[in-house]
Structure formats: C-alpha cells, structure tokens
Amino acid sequence: MVAVAGALWHQFAMAKKTYRGSCHCKKLRYEADLDLAEGTGKCNCSYCWKVRAWTMAIKPEAFRLLTGKESAREYGFREGSTNHHVFCGHCGVRLYTHGHVEEIGGDYVSVALSTLDDLSPSELVEAPVRYMNGRDDDWFHTPAETRHL
C-alpha cells in the first residue's frame, strides 16, 4: 500500500500546480507554479537560520505578486547584493526572495513554503529536501549537521 501511495504521489507531483500564498495579514498575496517533486531547500546561512527558511526556487515567470506591492519591503544582506528578501511591511512575514545567481540558472524567486495557503502538510512532508551549507559559503554541499534545519 505504501508503494502505491508513493507511486500516486510521484504521478501527482510530476506536474506543476498553482499555489496561492500570502503574508499573515493578507496584504501581500501571490501565486506560484510549483512542482514539489523538483525539490525544496533548507539552508544554514545566517539569514535562513534566523527565519528557519524552507523554500523552493523557481523561475520569475512562475511567480505572480497579486496584491500588496505597496506593502512589500525588501532586505538585502550586503551592499550590492543581488538577492533581496521580501517581507510585509505591516505584519513582518517574509514571503520570498528574488535575485540572480548564475550558478543556479540566473534569475530566480525562492518562495517561503510556510506562506503557501493551500499547501497540505502531506504535500510538504513528501517533497524532497536539499540542504545547503551557506554558513560555510559551500552552497553545493550538504552541511555536516541538518537535523536543526
């Protein structure tokens, strides 16, 4: 039975699904086309550590900010950074990061999975997770310890 459930999940997850997401106060709302079978990410860099990030990177054309552009605020960790963390200026919830990293294919949007309003717990726990060692600036290798992420 488990194998069948896994096979069904695999078939279900092979197609992109449009999810809706928002901040806590609902001033910012978005849609994102995701295929969770492509994998999600958890990182141990100083920023992700602070916000306990669990994300999924997608191409910008798969992301649509529907409402709240005027409430959106951005934070960049370093001067000149090409990565910008977007959060609601009213409730403070971080929704996504956007930027450009050539090594991962250029422009991207990284959606905070915790802000998806219609993501079921079963979909989330079935999604593959890739761990990144941002703390040591070794982004393409899994850190020695991941249980805390």
Segment roles from a protein language model:
Residues 5, 9-22, 27-149:
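A short Gly-Trp-Pro
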